[in-house]
Structures are given as C-alpha cells and as structure tokens.
Amino acid sequence: MLKLFSAFRKDKIWDFDGGIHPPEMKTQSNGTPLRQVPLAPRFIIPLKQHIGAEGELCVNVGDRVLRGQPLTRGRGRMLPVHAPTSGKVIAITPHSTAHPSALAELSVMIDADGEDRWIERDGWADYQRRSREELITRIHQFGVAGLGGAGFPTGVKLQGGGDKIETLIINAAECEPYITADDRLMQDCAAQVVEGIRILAHILQPREVLIGIEDNKPQAISMLRAVLADAHDIALRVIPTKYPSGGAKQLTQILTGKQVPHGGRSSDIGVLMQNVGTAYAVKRAVIDGEPITERVVTLTGESVSRPGNVWARLGTPVSHLLNDAGFCSSADQMVIMGGPLMGFTLPWLDVPVVKITNCLLAPSATEMGETPEEQGCIRCSACADACPADLLPQQLYWFSKGQQHDKATAHNIADCIECGACAWVCPSSIPLVQYFRQEKAEIYAIAQEEKRAAEAKARFEARQARLEREKAARLERHKNAAAQPAAKDQDAIAAALARVKEKQAQATQPVVINAGEKPDNSAVIAAREARKAQARARQAENIPAATEPVEPVDPRKAAVEAAIARAKARKQEQQTAAEPTEPVDPRKAAVEAAIARAKARKQEQQTAAEPTEPVDPRKAAVEAAIARAKARKQEQQAAAEPTEPVDPRKAAVEAAIARAKARKQEQQAAAEPAEPVDPRKAAVAAAIARVQAKKAAQQQVVNEE
C-alpha cells in the first residue's frame, strides 16, 4: 500500500485554469514515416532565425560553400546560421522571411550544386568527458535554437540556467491542432531524442528530468517507454489532452504544480524547459558533429494530396515543399505557417523555411470555413473563462482598441501567450489575438523610445558634468597662474620695489642749498637718464621683430633743433646772470624737484607707451622754422621793452592759475584716449615746459621777497 501511494505521489500531475478542446486534425499527417525532400535548386537562408541580433557575415558573393559551413559568426546571443547544402553564394540581399509582417531581412542565397557535400564532421561520442562550458559553446556555435516556436538560443538558455535548475522538462505535448512534427520525430527517432535529453541533463545536473506528452500520441508514448525501460534518470509523464497544455508556463504547472511569477521566467522557480526537436538537434550537434541544417516540418491540409512530415532543409522555399506534397492551389488559397490558432498566413510562397517552422497548413475553403464578420463585444466573459493565463481578454481588448497602454500593461498583457483560445470561443468573432499582438508591439516600441530618450539624457548630463569639470579645472589653473607670477614678472616687481626703497632713502636725506651756488642736479639728471634708458629698453622689447625699419634722422633738422636748444640755453644763462642771487628755500626746491621728476616720469611713460610713428621731414622743417621765428620775435620784444617791476600778488595769482590749468590739462589728458605723438616733438615740448617751470618758480621767489 505504501508503495502504491508513493507511486501515485511520484506520478502526480496538476491542472491549469482555462483551456479549450478544439478538433485535433492530427491523423492527416502522423500516420506516415518521415521522408526526405529533393533538394531545391536555390536556398534562401535568413541571417536572423532566432531571438536576438543577426550574426556577422563570414562569406562573400561567389564563395563556394559546403553543407554545415558557417555563413555567419555568433557572439553572445547572435546565433550562427549554416549552409544547408553545398553550392555557390550568388547573392546577399534582403528577402521576405517567415514573419506575419513579411518584412525583408538580410539573407544569403545559395545555388545548390547537387552534390550535397558535408564539411569535415568532428563528433564527441565521449561528451561526458567534456566540460560544461565546452558543451554549451559547441551547441551555440552549431546554431541550435529552440525548435518549438520561440527560437531562443539554446546555448544562452543553458548558460543562464546555471546551478539553480532542479527540474529539466522536455516538452513533447505538441498540443496545437494539425501539427505532428514532434509526434513523428519521437516515433522514428526516439533513441536519438533520449540521447539528446541525457546530454542536456549532463550539462544542467538537475534533480529530476520529466518528459511531458499528451495522451493523444500513443505510438510516441510506446516508443519512448521502450527506450526508457531500463532508465531511472528520466521520467515520462502522460498528461490529458487540452489546449494549450504545451505552453511553457502551463506545462510547468501541470508537471510540478508551480506557477511562473508575473514578469518572471521558469528558471526563477528552478525549472528549465526544452523541446523534443531541440533535444534531437543537441544530440546531432554534440555526438554527430552536425550543425542544424534541417528540421522536421508537417505538411498538412486538404489542399495537400500527400500530407505527412518531411526533413526540410533550412532555406528551402515553401513552394518547393508544397509542390513535393502535391499542393493544389486555388484563387483564394491560403497557406498558414504554424498551426491554425497560433500561426500566420503567408503573403506569398517564396518565403523560406527557418528554424522555427514546424508546420505548413494548406486548408481548403470548406475546411476552414468563411471568416465571420467581426461584431461588438457582448461582455459574455467566455474569453476570460478560456484564458489559460488568468487574464481578462475583454478588458485588454478595450484597452488595446483605445490605445490605453498604461492600463493594458497594468492588466498584465505581457503574460498573454497568444494561444488564440479567447478568439476561438468568442461569439462575436473578434480577432483578439491580433489586437493583443499589436498592442504589445506598440508598448514595446514606446519602451524602446523611452529607453533611447533616457540614454540620450544620460549622455547629455554626462557631457554637461564633463564640461563643468573642465571649466572648474580651467578656472583653477588660471587662478594658480595669477597667484604665482612668472619669473620675469617677479624680477620686474623686485626691481620696482628696489627703486622705491632707493627713492625713499634719498628723500630722507636733507637737501642743503647754499646761496649763490647753482644747484647740482647731476644725480637727478643721471637717474632720469637711467629711467629713460630702461623705458627705451622695455619699449624695444615690446616692439615685435617684424616692425617697420627706422627712418634715418634728417641732419638739417637735427642741426636746427640743436641751434634752438643752444639759443634757449644762452637766454636762460643771461637771465640767470642778470637776476640777483637770492637764497632758495630748501623745502620748496625739493618739492619743485619732486614735481618735475613726477612730470618727467609721466611724460616718459606716455612716450614709451605710445607707438613711434615715422616723422615727415617737410613738416618737421616747417615747425623748426616757425619755432626759430617765434624765438627771434621774443628776443626782439624782450630787448625793446623796458623791464618793469613785477607785482608779487599778481605773479602769485598767475602762477596758481597756471598750476590749475596744468592740473586740468593733465586730468583731461588722462581721461582722453592717447593719440600718437611725435617723440622728438614731445621731447622739445618737455624741455620747454621744464624751462618755463624754472622761470615761474624764480619769479615767484622774487615776488615773495
């Protein structure tokens, strides 16, 4: 009794909500063995036959290829595709593929040479000695993908399972009507299928391996039981026929009683599922060393005279397979790739067979019936009762029709497996699956756009942060450069400080002037000349090397200027000799000397700052002649007019007015923009100003006394 209960508990199965029981229509094709189809003259191999990006091309137009030779390289989720036969690559161009939209995808076209020669095959009969990574890499590089319809790369799926897989499930349910590819494969190749299952179990090391098969396949069940008679590591579970018990989530719940969480995967609960055809492809890749170049395809429907299952090479045009099966086309003939519930109608028949093609259904007009007209939803809830995913199809229908993407997402439209059970039972003939497919595609497109926008925003913010960092670093460099002057600037600052200290030391010494003696201004003159020399040196450094050449000095003009200077000097000596020698106030003399030095220094700075312009010889000669005429006139007037006594008050007032005007002129000169000045003319004016200043000072002293 205990053994009976133990056996009952071991073989226990569960059920799932919803589901339907449509006509099976499997006897049309499952009664005949697998057969080979003659090679097509031309093969069309799409580069993308799986979930993920297409691989990188490794052949060119004109290359000769052998069967099993890689046409692309697979990295990551990029699964390679292989040549289905030997021949020549005649084109690499977009071509319509097996998809409801019939969009063109990049494909390799090969003209078969009829020899069907293989590449050199290297099988691993001792796969038990190979590491897990080696086996997964071989499976991936040999192009094995899920052959149950999803097309997910098998190597990636095995790699993602890791060590957390406790149960390996082999899906042999094949629940959709008309399709018998897995049923016939298990009948004819049961031993190879079981060997592939053992390879998968060796890679994953699960606690248990379960094969789930519906009870409407008695021949396949008997063949598997015969192969597994002495095996204790693989358990066969026969489940009731119910659509869609072959769905991944539904079969997981039937065999384990566990439900895959919303938005999750079966691996989250320790379960990994593979298809029967995938297990057979794994065996051929590992043990036989053959990449996947063909698969079993069901050819069925009343429009086919020879229904059955065939070994179809990947890339074979659909029209070639149907013609081999005795296809009788009509004006309104439809051909469905897949089953009647989850398949799609082909727009034309030159579409190639790919890895996920398991059935080609060519029904007659009476077999499928007329397509009823879509009517309004009556809220009968029949779709909700039939939904195996516990969704509310009527609500999802309204959300999809009203473009309410947020509400559709909140009602778990992503969990819809598109089995078509809701549309099958709908009394209003609403194509619910089409609405759901379109809504999921729109939601996916919106999510991709939001992802791209977020990535663009992140790139913009990163750029702004980088610019801010660069700006802060630039300001810091400028700040450090301003705080630490260059060595040349430091030398100039030190020289200026030394000059200031020297002047302060000279100013502290008392100035002693004896009456009757001429002041000794040799030190002041020497210092002035030194400063002028420094200014000229600095000006010479600042002038670029590419300046215009200095024009030669006119000797006549120089002689005239020298004569004028000598005449003024004689006149000044005569006036000094005529006037009585009086004692000079030392403080006043020191102040006047300081003022003269300041003015001279300012004049030198202006002269050094202003650019030197070329002197017009004619203009200089005219100015010299005018100056000589004015000098003669002043000498004649001074000799003719008698010397009058000078009013001290009036002289003082005039001196004050002169000083005020001088200050005003200095302020205006500082405020107004500097104009180019002739350096020679400026020097003459400065000399005249100094003479006039000395004369005014002497007159003021006389007036005060």
Curated annotation (Swiss-Prot):
Part of a membrane-bound complex that couples electron transfer with translocation of ions across the membrane. Gene3D superfamilies: 3.30.70.20, NADH-ubiquinone oxidoreductase 51kDa subunit. This is Ion-translocating oxidoreductase complex subunit C. [4Fe-4S] cluster 1 binds at C377, C380, C383, C426. The complex is composed of six subunits: RnfA, RnfB, RnfC, RnfD, RnfE and RnfG. It holds the Pfam family Fer4_7. It is a peripheral membrane protein. The lineage of its organism: Bacteria, Pseudomonadati, Pseudomonadota, Gammaproteobacteria, Enterobacterales. HAMAP family: RsxC_RnfC (MF_00461). Residues 368-397, 407-435 form the 4Fe-4S ferredoxin-type domain. PANTHER family: ION-TRANSLOCATING OXIDOREDUCTASE COMPLEX SUBUNIT C. It comes from the Bacteria. Its cofactor is [4Fe-4S] cluster. The keyword Iron-sulfur applies. One of its GO terms (biological process) is electron transport chain. [4Fe-4S] cluster 2 binds at C387, C416, C419, C422. Keywords: 4Fe-4S, Cell inner membrane, Cell membrane, Electron transport, Iron, Iron-sulfur, Membrane, Metal-binding, Repeat, Translocase, Transport. It is an enzyme of class 7 (translocase). GO terms for molecular function: 4 iron, 4 sulfur cluster binding; electron transfer activity; metal ion binding. It comes from Citrobacter koseri (strain ATCC BAA-895 / CDC 4225-83 / SGSC4696).
